[in-house]
Amino acid sequence: MIREPYIFLSQNYAKYAENETASAASFKNLELSSLPRVLTFYLTDKYGNYINRSIDTLLLEDTNIVSATLEYEKDGQYYPWLTLSGNADTTVLLKDPFPVSACAIRLTIPEEHNPDVVTIGKLGFYKYLCDLCAETDSSFKVDANSGSYRTLSGDIVYYGDYGKWESKIKISNLPKEQFETLSQEVKDTSELTIIPFKDFDFSAVYECYLDPQIEYEVNRKTELYELKLEAQEL
Protein backbone atom coordinates (compact mmCIF):
# COMPACT_ATOMS: atom_id res chain seq x y z
CA MET A 1 0.00 0.00 0.00
CA ILE A 2 1.20 3.50 -0.85
CA ARG A 3 0.64 6.15 1.78
CA GLU A 4 0.44 9.70 0.42
CA PRO A 5 -1.88 12.70 0.75
CA TYR A 6 -4.88 13.01 -1.55
CA ILE A 7 -7.21 15.94 -2.17
CA PHE A 8 -10.81 15.10 -3.04
CA LEU A 9 -12.87 17.67 -4.93
CA SER A 10 -16.33 17.62 -6.47
CA GLN A 11 -16.41 17.30 -10.25
CA ASN A 12 -16.24 20.44 -12.41
CA TYR A 13 -19.61 21.09 -14.04
CA ALA A 14 -19.99 24.42 -15.86
CA LYS A 15 -20.66 26.04 -19.23
CA TYR A 16 -18.34 28.72 -20.51
CA ALA A 17 -19.62 31.90 -22.12
CA GLU A 18 -18.27 35.28 -23.16
CA ASN A 19 -20.30 38.46 -23.54
CA GLU A 20 -23.02 37.00 -21.30
CA THR A 21 -24.18 34.45 -23.90
CA ALA A 22 -24.33 30.93 -22.52
CA SER A 23 -22.78 28.28 -24.72
CA ALA A 24 -21.32 24.83 -24.46
CA ALA A 25 -17.93 26.07 -25.68
CA SER A 26 -14.94 24.31 -24.19
CA PHE A 27 -12.93 26.17 -21.59
CA LYS A 28 -9.87 24.01 -22.14
CA ASN A 29 -6.77 25.24 -24.00
CA LEU A 30 -7.87 28.87 -24.02
CA GLU A 31 -5.63 31.48 -25.64
CA LEU A 32 -6.73 34.98 -24.67
CA SER A 33 -5.37 38.14 -26.28
CA SER A 34 -6.62 41.73 -26.50
CA LEU A 35 -6.72 42.08 -22.73
CA PRO A 36 -8.58 42.92 -20.55
CA ARG A 37 -11.02 40.03 -20.94
CA VAL A 38 -14.08 39.03 -18.95
CA LEU A 39 -15.18 35.39 -19.05
CA THR A 40 -18.38 34.03 -17.53
CA PHE A 41 -18.90 30.44 -16.37
CA TYR A 42 -22.42 29.20 -15.63
CA LEU A 43 -22.56 26.40 -13.07
CA THR A 44 -24.52 23.25 -13.91
CA ASP A 45 -25.22 19.77 -12.67
CA LYS A 46 -23.66 16.72 -14.36
CA TYR A 47 -26.43 16.73 -16.97
CA GLY A 48 -25.86 20.34 -18.05
CA ASN A 49 -28.82 21.91 -16.23
CA TYR A 50 -28.15 25.36 -14.78
CA ILE A 51 -28.20 25.32 -10.97
CA ASN A 52 -26.84 27.05 -7.89
CA ARG A 53 -23.82 25.13 -6.63
CA SER A 54 -21.74 25.36 -3.50
CA ILE A 55 -18.10 25.94 -4.49
CA ASP A 56 -14.94 27.08 -2.74
CA THR A 57 -12.04 26.15 -5.01
CA LEU A 58 -10.55 27.35 -8.30
CA LEU A 59 -8.10 25.08 -10.14
CA LEU A 60 -6.03 26.27 -13.11
CA GLU A 61 -3.72 23.97 -15.07
CA ASP A 62 -1.08 24.70 -17.73
CA THR A 63 -1.48 28.45 -17.40
CA ASN A 64 0.72 31.52 -17.61
CA ILE A 65 -1.81 33.84 -15.99
CA VAL A 66 -0.26 36.23 -13.47
CA SER A 67 -3.20 38.17 -12.07
CA ALA A 68 -6.98 37.92 -12.18
CA THR A 69 -10.07 38.54 -10.09
CA LEU A 70 -13.13 36.34 -9.69
CA GLU A 71 -16.67 37.24 -8.69
CA TYR A 72 -19.64 34.99 -7.97
CA GLU A 73 -23.25 35.69 -8.91
CA LYS A 74 -26.08 35.34 -6.44
CA ASP A 75 -29.62 36.64 -6.98
CA GLY A 76 -28.54 38.60 -10.05
CA GLN A 77 -25.70 40.42 -8.26
CA TYR A 78 -21.94 39.79 -8.54
CA TYR A 79 -19.82 39.77 -5.38
CA PRO A 80 -16.00 39.65 -4.97
CA TRP A 81 -14.69 36.12 -4.49
CA LEU A 82 -11.04 35.19 -5.17
CA THR A 83 -7.98 37.16 -6.29
CA LEU A 84 -4.88 35.86 -8.08
CA SER A 85 -1.85 38.16 -7.86
CA GLY A 86 1.81 37.74 -8.79
CA ASN A 87 1.38 34.11 -9.84
CA ALA A 88 4.41 32.34 -11.32
CA ASP A 89 3.11 28.75 -11.22
CA THR A 90 1.62 26.78 -14.11
CA THR A 91 -0.80 24.97 -11.79
CA VAL A 92 -2.84 27.05 -9.36
CA LEU A 93 -5.25 25.98 -6.63
CA LEU A 94 -7.08 28.76 -4.77
CA LYS A 95 -9.41 27.86 -1.90
CA ASP A 96 -11.91 30.05 -0.10
CA PRO A 97 -12.28 28.92 3.55
CA PHE A 98 -16.01 29.64 3.28
CA PRO A 99 -17.97 28.04 0.40
CA VAL A 100 -20.24 30.29 -1.66
CA SER A 101 -23.51 29.32 -3.32
CA ALA A 102 -23.41 30.62 -6.88
CA CYS A 103 -25.03 30.19 -10.27
CA ALA A 104 -22.21 31.85 -12.24
CA ILE A 105 -18.57 32.91 -11.90
CA ARG A 106 -17.05 35.90 -13.66
CA LEU A 107 -13.30 35.86 -14.33
CA THR A 108 -11.65 39.20 -15.15
CA ILE A 109 -8.14 39.12 -16.63
CA PRO A 110 -6.56 42.61 -16.67
CA GLU A 111 -3.93 43.78 -19.11
CA GLU A 112 -1.61 44.93 -16.33
CA HIS A 113 0.97 42.34 -15.15
CA ASN A 114 -0.27 39.63 -17.54
CA PRO A 115 1.53 38.46 -20.73
CA ASP A 116 0.28 39.59 -24.14
CA VAL A 117 -1.40 36.21 -24.65
CA VAL A 118 -2.81 34.44 -21.59
CA THR A 119 -3.12 30.66 -21.89
CA ILE A 120 -5.25 28.40 -19.71
CA GLY A 121 -4.94 24.68 -20.35
CA LYS A 122 -7.83 23.86 -18.04
CA LEU A 123 -10.00 25.70 -15.56
CA GLY A 124 -12.49 24.36 -13.04
CA PHE A 125 -14.67 25.32 -10.08
CA TYR A 126 -15.03 22.78 -7.30
CA LYS A 127 -16.22 22.01 -3.79
CA TYR A 128 -13.37 20.93 -1.54
CA LEU A 129 -14.48 17.67 0.07
CA CYS A 130 -11.50 16.58 2.17
CA ASP A 131 -7.79 15.93 2.21
CA LEU A 132 -5.82 13.57 4.42
CA CYS A 133 -3.30 10.76 4.28
CA ALA A 134 -5.15 7.95 2.55
CA GLU A 135 -3.81 4.43 2.27
CA THR A 136 -3.93 3.70 -1.43
CA ASP A 137 -3.13 1.00 -3.93
CA SER A 138 -2.63 2.80 -7.23
CA SER A 139 -1.69 1.52 -10.66
CA PHE A 140 -1.97 2.53 -14.30
CA LYS A 141 -4.62 0.66 -16.24
CA VAL A 142 -3.29 -0.78 -19.51
CA ASP A 143 -6.09 -1.15 -22.04
CA ALA A 144 -5.21 -3.35 -25.02
CA ASN A 145 -8.47 -2.37 -26.76
CA SER A 146 -7.72 1.29 -27.39
CA GLY A 147 -10.54 2.95 -29.29
CA SER A 148 -13.33 0.75 -27.96
CA TYR A 149 -16.16 1.75 -25.64
CA ARG A 150 -16.71 0.09 -22.33
CA THR A 151 -19.70 0.41 -20.01
CA LEU A 152 -18.71 0.78 -16.38
CA SER A 153 -22.02 1.43 -14.66
CA GLY A 154 -25.41 2.37 -16.02
CA ASP A 155 -25.07 5.20 -18.51
CA ILE A 156 -21.40 5.77 -17.67
CA VAL A 157 -19.30 4.92 -20.74
CA TYR A 158 -15.53 4.78 -20.60
CA TYR A 159 -13.57 5.39 -23.79
CA GLY A 160 -10.78 2.83 -23.89
CA ASP A 161 -7.28 4.26 -23.95
CA TYR A 162 -3.77 3.36 -22.86
CA GLY A 163 -2.38 4.26 -19.46
CA LYS A 164 -5.59 5.27 -17.72
CA TRP A 165 -5.28 5.65 -13.96
CA GLU A 166 -7.22 3.47 -11.56
CA SER A 167 -6.93 3.08 -7.84
CA LYS A 168 -8.42 1.49 -4.77
CA ILE A 169 -8.39 4.12 -2.04
CA LYS A 170 -8.87 3.46 1.66
CA ILE A 171 -9.42 6.57 3.75
CA SER A 172 -8.91 6.09 7.47
CA ASN A 173 -9.78 8.18 10.55
CA LEU A 174 -12.45 10.14 8.72
CA PRO A 175 -14.72 12.38 10.86
CA LYS A 176 -18.44 11.78 10.40
CA GLU A 177 -19.09 15.12 8.65
CA GLN A 178 -16.35 14.53 6.05
CA PHE A 179 -17.45 10.92 5.59
CA GLU A 180 -21.03 12.01 4.92
CA THR A 181 -19.97 14.80 2.54
CA LEU A 182 -17.60 12.62 0.52
CA SER A 183 -19.82 9.53 0.36
CA GLN A 184 -22.90 11.57 -0.59
CA GLU A 185 -21.02 13.20 -3.48
CA VAL A 186 -20.00 9.76 -4.75
CA LYS A 187 -23.57 8.46 -4.49
CA ASP A 188 -25.04 11.56 -6.19
CA THR A 189 -22.67 11.90 -9.15
CA SER A 190 -20.35 8.83 -9.29
CA GLU A 191 -17.59 11.31 -10.19
CA LEU A 192 -14.83 13.11 -8.28
CA THR A 193 -11.72 15.10 -9.05
CA ILE A 194 -8.75 13.53 -7.26
CA ILE A 195 -5.35 15.13 -6.75
CA PRO A 196 -2.62 12.78 -5.49
CA PHE A 197 0.34 14.60 -3.97
CA LYS A 198 3.92 13.43 -4.26
CA ASP A 199 6.59 15.16 -2.20
CA PHE A 200 3.91 17.69 -1.26
CA ASP A 201 3.50 18.86 -4.84
CA PHE A 202 0.93 18.27 -7.57
CA SER A 203 1.69 15.04 -9.39
CA ALA A 204 -1.48 15.11 -11.51
CA VAL A 205 -5.15 16.01 -11.48
CA TYR A 206 -7.58 13.21 -12.34
CA GLU A 207 -11.27 13.37 -13.20
CA CYS A 208 -12.53 9.99 -12.08
CA TYR A 209 -15.51 7.68 -12.18
CA LEU A 210 -16.27 6.33 -8.70
CA ASP A 211 -18.15 3.12 -8.02
CA PRO A 212 -21.25 4.35 -6.12
CA GLN A 213 -21.36 1.10 -4.11
CA ILE A 214 -19.01 2.27 -1.36
CA GLU A 215 -17.73 0.25 1.57
CA TYR A 216 -17.18 1.71 5.02
CA GLU A 217 -16.63 0.85 8.66
CA VAL A 218 -17.00 2.97 11.79
CA ASN A 219 -14.95 2.71 14.96
CA ARG A 220 -17.53 2.81 17.75
CA LYS A 221 -14.97 4.07 20.27
CA THR A 222 -13.49 6.93 18.25
CA GLU A 223 -16.57 7.47 16.02
CA LEU A 224 -14.18 7.80 13.06
CA TYR A 225 -14.92 6.20 9.69
CA GLU A 226 -12.93 4.15 7.21
CA LEU A 227 -14.12 4.59 3.63
CA LYS A 228 -13.11 2.44 0.65
CA LEU A 229 -13.43 3.86 -2.87
CA GLU A 230 -12.67 2.49 -6.33
CA ALA A 231 -11.71 5.16 -8.86
CA GLN A 232 -11.03 5.05 -12.61
CA GLU A 233 -9.84 7.98 -14.68
CA LEU A 234 -12.43 9.24 -17.16
Label the predicted regions.
Residues M1-V38, Y42-I65, Y78-L234:
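Extracellular/virion structural assembly segments
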Residues T69-E71:
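Beta-strand signatures of extracellular beta-sandwich domains
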